């Protein structure tokens, strides 16, 4: 539903009707929440910012929801070849626009999806959009997300929520102020596996947990050291300066766009930023983790420009209520924890190159990637375990929950308050890696007690016109 004065009038008339409500009535958010909330019976009109592989994937997911309509697509790149990469095929605003129009013209033959290079121009012209899905490279997440929320738009932002810790705090603050519906794109958070893991742990399935190991084989997107020396021409249809966004100008190189930006500190956050929002998520939720006391990281090589090919990160978290202190270790780039002796010979550690392992006083819980398919080790303990009641509300789907929130339903479970905390924990690991120090973290003041040089990684600088505000 587009934001129109008619809806405001309807809301005022409803509130003036004494027969409609009593003092004890609880009204849905779409009535009380102002023009930003969409009536449950209406469509949610959405703009997508970022039309790469993940933007295309999100568009497909939204097109499966009957009450969502993608009305605008924005990306500095018209068209790019993703066939050498995970996503395959082509992406960019023109291929994704064509995909969107092919879908909606089946119901509305005259349907047209608007296209834009610059999200700021789109926000100025497309006043009727209700919500924004952000699937840009990491370094632009916070800039677009903050601007959209300030305009009263509901926002779904891909993970990690931000590129640095200061941005995570700002985005959480703006979300609290604007009260829009928010969701980060760590899709496993809406899965059954992560809910089962939490419920089992809270029921004492493996007793007190003092150690967690999580991992992903992801990594190795860029090769260093330093920036590329070559300066090839910018491909036709790519606005390179716009793609750089808040970052200082540097010459175009295919090592950055369309895919391998993940391996450059200026644009990406490495494998831990890309995958720990999935695979560490069960630990943060189940163990009620907040700020760590300290974090340290090690890697065969640390470069000022290129993300390490592989690394290990070690976090120390304090006790939380009746939960004891816990050590959390993250591995990426093919590094793994030691294989548990309780695993059967034919059992895989985790699943698909990803996983998480909880070590408790009475046993272990192992999950695959995204917190999926939890099992208790050893198998004998799994066989005798009486599964507890399902106490966590089940999700209808990651995008579905967000759309329902846009219509006045409850905030999704990976809303920006939670997502900012998870993102901050993840990104603090990169601060330790880049400073090459064990960081003692002052959470309240957002600083590394023993490493003033970490400040430039905690809060980055921005080109004029690209500030997070």
PLM feature segments, named:
Residues 2-151, 169-181:
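N-terminal glycine-/serine-/threonine-rich beta1-alpha1-beta2 phosphate-ribose binding loop
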Residues 45-49, 70-75, 133-134, 156-157, ...:
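Structural recognition of the beta-strand scaffold that forms the well-ordered cores
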Residues 65-68, 173-181, 203-207, 287-291, ...:
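Secondary-structure transition/capping motifs at alpha-helix termini
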Residues 57, 91, 95, 118-121, ...:
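Extracytoplasmic/secreted proteins, especially bacterial periplasmic and envelope-associated proteins
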Residues 32, 196, 208-417, 423-469:
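Contiguous beta-strand/loop segments that form the cofactor/metal-binding neighborhood of enzyme cores
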Residues 15, 59, 74, 97, ...:
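Non-transmembrane alpha-helical segments in soluble domains
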Residues 154-156, 162-237:
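A contiguous active-site-proximal alpha/beta segment in oxidoreductase catalytic domains
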Residues 116, 135-141, 161-163, 167-168, ...:
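Short, solvent-exposed turn/loop segments enriched in Gly/Ser/Thr/Pro and often Arg
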């Amino acid at each position: 539903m587009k934001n129109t004065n008619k809806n405001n009038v309807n809301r005022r008339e409803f509130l003036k009707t004494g027969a409609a409500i009593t003092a004890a009535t609880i009204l849905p958010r779409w009535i009380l929440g102002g023009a930003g909330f969409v009536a449950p019976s209406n469509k949610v009109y959405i703009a997508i910012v970022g039309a790469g592989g993940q933007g295309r994937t999100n568009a497909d997911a939204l097109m499966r929801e009957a009450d969502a309509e993608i009305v605008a697509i924005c990306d500095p790149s018209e068209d790019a070849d993703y066939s050498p990469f995970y996503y395959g095929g082509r992406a960019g605003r023109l291929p994704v626009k064509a995909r969107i129009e092919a879908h909606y013209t089946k119901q509305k033959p005259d349907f047209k999806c608007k296209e834009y290079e610059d999200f700021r121009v789109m926000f100025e012209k497309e006043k009727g959009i209700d919500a924004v899905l952000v699937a840009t490279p990491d370094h632009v997440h916070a800039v677009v997300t903050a601007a959209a929320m300030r305009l009263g738009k509901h926002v779904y932002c891909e993970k990690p929520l931000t590129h640095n810790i200061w941005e995570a705090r700002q985005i959480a603050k703006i979300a609290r102020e604007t009260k829009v519906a928010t969701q980060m794109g760590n899709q496993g958070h809406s899965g059954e596996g992560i809910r089962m893991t939490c419920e089992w742990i809270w029921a004492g399935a493996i007793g007190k947990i003092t150690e967690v190991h999580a991992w992903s084989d992801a990594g190795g997107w860029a090769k260093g050291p330093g920036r590329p020396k070559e300066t090839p021409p910018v491909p036709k249809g790519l606005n390179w300066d716009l793609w750089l966004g808040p970052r200082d100008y540097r010459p175009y190189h295919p090592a950055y766009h369309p895919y391998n930006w993940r391996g450059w500190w200026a644009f990406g956050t490495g494998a831990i930023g890309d995958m720990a929002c999935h695979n560490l998520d069960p630990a943060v939720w189940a163990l009620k983790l907040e700020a760590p006391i300290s974090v340290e990281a090690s890697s065969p090589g640390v470069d000022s420009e290129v993300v390490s090919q592989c690394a290990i990160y070690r976090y120390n978290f304090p006790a939380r209520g009746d939960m004891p202190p816990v050590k959390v270790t993250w591995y990426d780039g093919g590094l793994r924890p030691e294989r548990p002796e309780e695993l059967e010979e034919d059992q895989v550690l985790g699943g698909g190159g990803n996983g998480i392992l909880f070590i408790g006083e009475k046993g272990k819980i192992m999950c695959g990637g995204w917190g999926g398919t939890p099992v208790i080790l050893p198998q004998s303990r799994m066989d005798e375990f009486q599964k507890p009641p399902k106490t966590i509300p089940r999700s209808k789907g990651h995008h579905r929950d967000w759309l329902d929130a846009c219509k006045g339903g409850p905030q999704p479970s990976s809303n920006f308050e939670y997502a900012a905390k998870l993102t901050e924990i993840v990104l603090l690991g990169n601060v330790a890696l880049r400073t090459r120090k064990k960081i003692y973290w002052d959470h309240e003041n957002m600083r590394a007690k023993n490493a003033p040089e970490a400040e430039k990684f905690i809060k980055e600088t921005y080109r004029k016109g690209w500030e997070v505000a």
